[in-house]
Amino acid sequence: MTETASTRASFVIGDEAAARRVTDLLGESFDDGELAIAAFERPDRSWEVSLHFGEMPNLDGVRALVAQAAGDAAAAAMTVESIAAKDWVAASLEGLVPVPAGRFVVHGSHDRARIPSNKLGIEIEAALAFGTGHHGTTRGCLTLLDLVLRAGPPRSVLDLGTGTGVLAIAAAKALRQPVLATDIDRQSVAVAKENARLNGVGNLVEAVHATGFSAPVFAAWGPFDLVLANILANPLRQLSTPMSQHLAPSALVILSGLLQPQAQSVIAAYRARGCVLLRQIVIEGWSSLLLAKTF
């Protein structure tokens, strides 16, 4: 790519929903060759959004778009810097380093050739950086998934709240068998499908829009021998009953998306439904749980 000077703008906003609104609006407002967008969750659960422009944009217009999507405070807090002449698309990927977790390595396309042959690479583009594996919950889930798969292949696998599809892709690549991935957000379902295709498992990951366990697809695929759910503590507690009803005997469950102080209440909710804790991993203050159904 021809080297040109570029402009980087960044700001921090309160939550994932706001980050999605910003990235959606800016993505619609600029051509692919004009702008690269990356959004990353921070330890305090706020989101940092980085915008890399190939040429100096109309900054007043950019601030207006940010204000429209995320409010005046985010627009006012936006910082702007000039990046020396180089490949500005590559610059947008500098913070997206490969993340190892067990046998898996989550990476961007710029690191594709650097993944060791004894690892399973999961490629997620920076422009689709919601759930890239850089958050402690995703790394914890992948580590536990690697542990579970060493004990033998589950027959039926569900990734509930799939997001970008990282966990479903990991399971499909390791098992070479179909995996069901569901999400309440239609955009996430579309992203998961595309990521599965890019990772060579588009024919193995069935990504479906579904809320909770009410959709017919759960009965068609279940009961499940392995469920992965990297969502939030409250939904995990609320789903303990319907999830337990869709588990096969001796099924394993990997849960995350909860802060360490929230873990005990989630463990208690699933214990009441016949699931016992086998292992807990804490990464950067976030807990990932491995449970087994006992009855």
From Swiss-Prot:
Reply yes or no: does the keyword Cytoplasm apply.
yes
Where on the tree of life does the source sit, at the highest rank? Bacteria
Q: Which InterPro entries does the entry link to? A: Ribosomal_L11_MeTrfase_PrmA, Ribosomal_PrmA_MeTrfase, SAM-dependent_MTases_sf
Which enzyme class? transferase
**EC number, UniProt record:** 2.1.1.-
Q: Name one GO molecular function term.
A: protein-lysine N-methyltransferase activity
Which residues bind S-adenosyl-L-methionine per the record? T138, G161, D183, N230
Sorted alphabetically, the Gene Ontology BP terms of this entry are: methylation
What this protein catalyses is: L-lysyl-[protein] + 3 S-adenosyl-L-methionine = N(6),N(6),N(6)-trimethyl-L-lysyl-[protein] + 3 S-adenosyl-L-homocysteine + 3 H(+)
GO cellular component, as recorded: cytoplasm
Alphabetic keyword roster: Cytoplasm, Methyltransferase, S-adenosyl-L-methionine, Transferase
Intracellular or extracellular location(s): Cytoplasm
Is Zinc a UniProt keyword of this protein? no
Principal localisation: cytoplasm
Function comment: Methylates ribosomal protein L11.
- Record's family? Belongs to the methyltransferase superfamily. PrmA family.
| Protein name according to UniProt | Ribosomal protein L11 methyltransferase
Give the originating organism: Rhodopseudomonas palustris (strain BisB5)
